[in-house]
Amino acid sequence: MTIIRKKHPLIKMINHSFIDLPTPSNISSWWNFGSLLGLCLMIQILTGLFLAMHYTSDTTTAFSSVAHICRDVNYGWLIRYMHANGASMFFICLFLHVGRGVYYGSYNMIETWNMGIILLFAVMATAFMGYVLPWGQMSFWGATVITNLLSAIHYVGTTLVEWIWGGFSVDTATLTRFFAFHFILPFIITALVLVHLLFLHETGSNNPTGLNSDADKIPFHPYFTVKDFLGVLILLMVFMILTLFFPDILGDPDNYTPANPLNTPPHIKPEWYFLFAYAILRSIPNKLGGVLALILSILILALMPLLHTSKQRALIFRPITQTMYWILVADLLILTWIGGQPVEYPFIIIGQAASIAYFAIIVILMPIAGMIENNILDLD
């Protein structure tokens, strides 16, 4: 008799995705981040649900309701800090997951890759709206600055901004709708994750060599369930150390001041995970140009399959492109640092140079390096 996991319509789907899934035997720990992102999403949905039970999305009470959660609700402080730092862990895993995809040429699985880009945009939108909810100074001014960027769109821009605000400034209408969207988006993200996995399981996982691994596959369980569990333990350990010992290290002190439309903070900046894109936005003097560069900084990932010139898939045996890749990583760290600095000399020029380097490496240098390597290895 066939065991239930292979027969039952519902369990059969889980079986094909997480138990009997044929997996390349040589995938490294860089392949752990998919499951860790799933864990982060679950943590965020659960903590967010409990926060939503006590939060009020009205400008007069939003800040006080967050203070009430931290002071009066049982373990409210823990739930709040888990949710805030959970977002940071989510983005750390996201960036490493995308970085892994770029390094090992996973972008050649085009449907999975494009679905991943849509997911990245959705998660970024969710995080941005979540940052507005505590209604501190940085929440209010961050929302004002970022939504105002839409006014750069010709003809309809101003109308669009006022439509999103629900008035002539960021106010209760804006906060209420941001809360509604922030609540619903994680569930949409969960659905998109299932589509992401559906596309992935059509082609099967990539592996560190970038070669076809059909001849050497093993079941996902128990080998990779155990391996993923180690990743889960490490993530939870780092997460709890961050949450319990350094809960505010990644936040902005300005957000402990209630929102005040009459008082602008000296340096308006988003959360750390948006700083690289914020630096690219600020490095262009023109408003519309900055907005386009901001969108392109993420959307450029969609061009990666077209910019792949090498006959090899992964970077593991491609030292020139490897060098370009690590320069790109360093460049992103520089952009992150610049995004948090005031707009003055020398930060402006460093930001502009780093922004040019970011696009140049992806669009020009890495494809050229791929062609050079083909010639060196006589692969043409």
UniProtKB/Swiss-Prot annotation:
Binding site for a ubiquinone: H201
Residues binding heme b b566: H97, H196
Principal location: mitochondrion
Residues reported to bind heme b b562: H83, H182
Source organism superkingdom: Eukaryota
Signal sequence annotation: none
Protein topology in the membrane: Multi-pass membrane protein
Cofactor comment text: Binds 2 heme b groups non-covalently.
Record GO cellular component, one term: respiratory chain complex III
BP-aspect Gene Ontology terms: mitochondrial electron transport, ubiquinol to cytochrome c
Annotated keywords: Electron transport, Heme, Iron, Membrane, Metal-binding, Mitochondrion, Mitochondrion inner membrane, Respiratory chain, Transmembrane, Transmembrane helix, Transport, Ubiquinone
InterPro entries attached to this UniProt entry: Cyt_b/b6_C, Cyt_b/b6_C_sf, Cyt_b/b6_N, Cytb/b6-like_sf, Cytochrome_b, Cytochrome_b_C_euk/bac, Cytochrome_b_N_euk/bac, Di-haem_cyt_TM
Family matches, as Pfam families: Cytochrom_B_C (PF00032), Cytochrome_B (PF00033)
Ranges annotated as spanning the membrane: 33-53, 77-98, 113-133, 178-198, 226-246, 288-308, 320-340, 347-367
Localization of this protein: Mitochondrion inner membrane
Molecular function via GO: metal ion binding; ubiquinol-cytochrome-c reductase activity
Cofactor (UniProt): heme b
Functional description taken from the UniProt entry: Component of the ubiquinol-cytochrome c reductase complex (complex III or cytochrome b-c1 complex) that is part of the mitochondrial respiratory chain. The b-c1 complex mediates electron transfer from ubiquinol to cytochrome c. Contributes to the generation of a proton gradient across the mitochondrial membrane that is then used for ATP synthesis.
Family affiliation: Belongs to the cytochrome b family.
Note in the entry: Heme 1 (or BL or b562) is low-potential and absorbs at about 562 nm, and heme 2 (or BH or b566) is high-potential and absorbs at about 566 nm.
Subunit structure and binding partners: The cytochrome bc1 complex contains 11 subunits: 3 respiratory subunits (MT-CYB, CYC1 and UQCRFS1), 2 core proteins (UQCRC1 and UQCRC2) and 6 low-molecular weight proteins (UQCRH/QCR6, UQCRB/QCR7, UQCRQ/QCR8, UQCR10/QCR9, UQCR11/QCR10 and a cleavage product of UQCRFS1). This cytochrome bc1 complex then forms a dimer.
Protein name per UniProt: Cytochrome b
Gene: MT-CYB
